[in-house]
Amino acid sequence: MARVKRSVNAKKKRRAILKSAKGYRGQRSRLYRKAKEQWLHSMTYAYRDRRARKSEFRKLWIQRINAAARMNDITYNRLIHGLRLAEIEVDRKILAELAVNDFEAFSALCEAAKAALPEDVNAPKAA
């Protein structure tokens, strides 16, 4: 079996790692071993944070919906429950968008949710 010389492939691989490590601080952008270590960590962080971003956005949408719902005298959980009872299928992303950019439409949805809720749920709780 012939001997394999890795020169071309190894240089190509190292060049690719160093290219993707551009912008890293200090030796991490210049030395191959340090760059590869940092690059592997950065790929791990990127993978993890792509998943974390989804829950962060959901939390943001819920906060925006709750704030706008309270301006319409209804809480977030009663709004969502009322929309389900009224068979209005709007996801949280769209609800948050309506709350920020089209408050009249959001208010109409709040009124529909209030109307769909049972009367005992609409009544304010006695202290």
From Swiss-Prot:
A GO biological process held by the record: ribosomal large subunit assembly
InterPro entries, A to Z: Ribosomal_bL20 (IPR005813), RIBOSOMAL_L20_CS (IPR049946), Ribosomal_protein_bL20_C (IPR035566)
Keywords annotated in UniProt: Ribonucleoprotein, Ribosomal protein, RNA-binding, rRNA-binding
One Gene Ontology cellular component: ribonucleoprotein complex
The keyword Lyase belongs to this UniProt entry's keyword annotation: no
GO MF entries: rRNA binding; structural constituent of ribosome
Coiled coil (UniProt feature): none
Record-linked Gene3D superfamilies: 6.10.160.10, Ribosomal protein L20 (1.10.1900.20)
UniProt cross-references to HAMAP family, sorted A to Z: Ribosomal_bL20
Protein function: Binds directly to 23S ribosomal RNA and is necessary for the in vitro assembly process of the 50S ribosomal subunit. It is not involved in the protein synthesizing functions of that subunit.
NCBIfam families registered for this protein in UniProt: rplT_bact
Family that this chain belongs to: Belongs to the bacterial ribosomal protein bL20 family.
Record protein name field: Large ribosomal subunit protein bL20
The organism of origin for this protein: Corynebacterium aurimucosum (strain ATCC 700975 / DSM 44827 / CIP 107346 / CN-1)
Gene symbol of the encoding locus: rplT
